[in-house]
Amino acid sequence: MPRDWDAATYDRLPIPMTAWGETVLGWLELRGDERVLDAGCGTGKVTEMLRDRLPRGSVVALDGSVSMVEQARARLGDDRVEYLVADLREPLPVSPPVDAILSTATFHWIADHDALFANLAAVLRPGGQLAAQCGGAGNIASIETALGEIDEDLRGRKHFATPEATAARLEAAGFVEVETWLHEEPTPLPEGDLEPYLETICLGDHVEGMSPEQRRAFVHEVASRMPEPLIDYVRLNIRARRA
């Protein structure tokens, strides 16, 4: 199963994904009465914007983390939102099929993108829209470099795909009108936020299972090897329709 997250800390940090999610949401052509899946809803900040775009519709808020889903429920309540804890690597318990799928900052946590896109296609009606953004090729290069300096085996645990490979996988899964592209989003962090941000957002899969002291030492070492308190994000953008 996917790892759980520190949802409360995640919610407090100055994450840029909410603003990026608003942009991705704008790619969906919505009447307001659709049923839309938020695949990787996190704490529900983007889900809330999505629900507000659907005054006569509803949202399926899905995440692999129990604490994230609980935080989303606390934010949104049960008004036109269905909550699911599920693994995007497996067939999804979503029925009937949805009219559209939105996803932000999720796909790069999943190794098997062929299975991911097949599972999404299976719960999306024919003609339904997919709008997504995740980490793409070259994402967080300064962090990956720092990890490699500590131990080469620490690099490459996330799955930052190229636009070309992603387009091919989407088409193989039954998507058409596929558009994929990269753009850079360098994100400076306020003083004092770098290490909490790294621990919660970027290095959570590395520090899972460590003691608090080990976590702090590891995160500090990574941070000390970065040239500046800036996360060098590269985003992979995805737009497509189900055939």
Regions found by a protein language model. Name each.
Residues 110-111, 124-126:
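Helix-to-beta-strand junctions that scaffold the AdoMet/dcAdoMet cofactor pocket
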Residues 173, 178-229:
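C-terminal helical/coil "lid" or tail adjacent to the Rossmann-like core of SAM-dependent
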